[in-house]
């Protein structure tokens, strides 16, 4: 028995641990010691990647279909971690293999805030919905 179309997939247990781009690491350190203020322009947006980025450069973002970045509301940090407080749905996906995510602020020229790989890549086909359950995207600093 096949899944009804469009398919819906849920991913759990994704963690971004200390995967901050160099520019954000520097901005947060400057803010921490008071040399430069850091101003966040929200909301935080979650983007899906078909190739992962690193500290120096962004990955390759999904394109096509009705794909678009999704606004992400977050819990209050506790124990060095913070998670998404609501389910996140990417509807109308194009055919793609999603291997990671990146977080962006939402100002005129969005800044990449964090990045990370999925523990297991997810193949989606045209029209699918890719879903992240509440509390499944975790950011942590140690």
Predicted feature residues:
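Small cysteine-rich, disulfide-bonded extracellular modules of the LU/uPAR three-finger superfamily
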Residues: 9-100, 105-142
């Amino acid at each position: 028995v096949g899944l009804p179309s469009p398919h819906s997939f849920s991913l759990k247990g994704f963690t971004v641990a200390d995967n901050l781009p160099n520019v954000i690491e520097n901005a947060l350190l400057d803010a921490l010691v008071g040399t430069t203020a850091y101003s966040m322009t929200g909301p935080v947006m979650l983007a899906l990647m078909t190739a992962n980025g690193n500290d120096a450069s962004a990955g390759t973002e999904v394109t096509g279909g009705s794909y678009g970045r999704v606004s992400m509301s977050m819990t209050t940090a506790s124990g060095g971690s913070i998670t998404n407080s609501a389910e996140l749905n990417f509807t109308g996906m194009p055919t793609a293999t999603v291997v990671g995510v990146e977080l962006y602020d939402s100002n005129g020229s969005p800044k990449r805030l964090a990045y990370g790989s999925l523990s297991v890549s997810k193949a989606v086909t045209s029209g699918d919905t890719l879903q992240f359950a509440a509390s499944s995207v975790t950011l942590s600093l140690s």
